[in-house]
């Protein structure tokens, strides 16, 4: 089992700890509903140090990432980030990731914890030459997310960086508690907030300082349970649920980060083909009853014929009703289409709805 540099803090806080991607991580502290509400209404603090960090630099780094990822690396300016995908040749998803441009031919990637080794191996397999340097920095860096409408007010107590000047999906390097930190206006909750990346040895100090500065604002530590309900309300994909090696970006409603016009990239031909012949599509749905849809449950039509499968589901703390995502035959993907979730042998009526389930301003 692996541990993040903040593991002792989670133990001291009495967090319920679970195995996630080989890390012992907090799934909740005071409860998923309390933590979810705090992020939507005030501010929450997340340890996401289990995520992976890679550095890509050297002559040819831009061209390398342009070939490896679906989004247009050429469009990045210094200090800007983009959401993107790594694909296999058949269009299946290796992983989703964030690509940060630090400087010309110098990039920083954040990948999913469950895919660190796989992703790094995939990049190494396609490394063009020794001029492009790939470095896996996952074991030396920590990642803390501060999210919610009061996140900026809290973080501003600990840094001289003008946070209001950092636009959405932009970042700067600056001092937090006097320690060099990558400060990025990004997140996985739909709320305003920042993700902070720092050397492991500074993580505890920064965490404690954020908690102390956040007490007047109602800050709470937030576990992976609420992280999941928050992301699901926004319709954000989670690797292993909405996307995996068998899903194509166009099926997963990720055509907006798949830039077919940019030139060649791994998986492009499969994406071109899939865009023309979409047999299944990822949709969001709400249920009329109280039962919660779970990953793997069948989605059926009224006659009981299989038309798809559930990817994720939860009782939305904000909406107060069950929501979910799933793949359905494209003919059932229109908004307001009636579908049925087979929950323990009983068909529960659901309606396809527009995603995100919530509309937030960041």
Curated annotation (Swiss-Prot):
The keyword ATP-binding does not apply. GO terms for cellular component: cytosol; glycine cleavage complex. Its EC number is 2.1.2.10. GO terms for biological process: glycine decarboxylation via glycine cleavage system. Keywords: Aminotransferase, Transferase. GO terms for molecular function: aminomethyltransferase activity; transaminase activity. It is an enzyme of class 2 (transferase). It catalyses: N(6)-[(R)-S(8)-aminomethyldihydrolipoyl]-L-lysyl-[protein] + (6S)-5,6,7,8-tetrahydrofolate = N(6)-[(R)-dihydrolipoyl]-L-lysyl-[protein] + (6R)-5,10-methylene-5,6,7,8-tetrahydrofolate + NH4(+). It holds the Pfam family GCV_T. The glycine cleavage system catalyzes the degradation of glycine. HAMAP family: GcvT. The glycine cleavage system is composed of four proteins: P, T, L and H. PANTHER family: AMINOMETHYLTRANSFERASE, AMINOMETHYLTRANSFERASE, MITOCHONDRIAL. Belongs to the GcvT family. This is Aminomethyltransferase.
């Amino acid at each position: 089992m692996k541990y993040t540099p903040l593991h002792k803090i989670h133990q001291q806080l009495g967090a319920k700890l679970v195995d996630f991607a080989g890390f012992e991580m907090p799934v909740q502290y005071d409860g998923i509903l309390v933590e979810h509400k705090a992020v939507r209404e005030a501010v929450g603090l997340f340890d996401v140090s289990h995520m992976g960090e890679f550095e890509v630099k050297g002559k040819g780094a831009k061209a390398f990432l342009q070939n490896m990822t679906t989004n247009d690396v050429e469009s990045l300016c210094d200090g800007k980030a983009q959401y993107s995908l790594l694909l296999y040749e058949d269009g299946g998803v290796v992983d989703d990731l964030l690509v940060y441009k630090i400087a010309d031919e110098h990039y920083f990637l954040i990948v999913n914890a469950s895919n660190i080794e796989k992703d790094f191996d995939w990049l190494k397999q396609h490394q063009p030459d020794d001029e492009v340097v790939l470095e896996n920095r996952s074991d030396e860096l920590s990642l803390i997310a501060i999210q919610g409408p009061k996140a900026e007010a809290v973080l501003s107590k600990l840094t001289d960086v003008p946070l209001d000047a950092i636009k959405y999906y932009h970042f700067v390097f600056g001092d937090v508690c006097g320690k060099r930190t990558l400060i990025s206006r990004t997140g996985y909750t739909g709320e305003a907030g920042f993700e902070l990346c720092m050397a492991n040895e500074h993580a505890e100090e920064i965490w404690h300082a954020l908690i102390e500065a956040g007490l007047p604002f109602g800050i709470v530590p937030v576990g992976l349970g609420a992280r999941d309900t928050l992301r699901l309300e926004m319709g954000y994909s989670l690797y292993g649920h909405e996307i995996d090696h068998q899903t194509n970006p166009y099926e997963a409603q990720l055509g907006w980060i798949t830039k077919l016009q940019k030139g060649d990239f791994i998986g492009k031909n499969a994406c071109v083909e899939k865009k023309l012949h979409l047999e299944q599509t990822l949709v969001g749905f709400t249920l009329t009853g109280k039962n919660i849809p779970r990953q793997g449950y069948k989605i059926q039509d009224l006659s009981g014929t299989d038309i798809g499968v559930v990817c994720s589901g939860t009782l939305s703390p904000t909406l107060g009703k069950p929501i979910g995502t799933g793949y359905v035959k494209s003919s059932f993907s229109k908004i307001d289409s009636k579908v049925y979730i087979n929950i323990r042998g009983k068909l529960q009526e659901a309606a396809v709805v527009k995603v995100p389930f919530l509309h937030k301003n960041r």
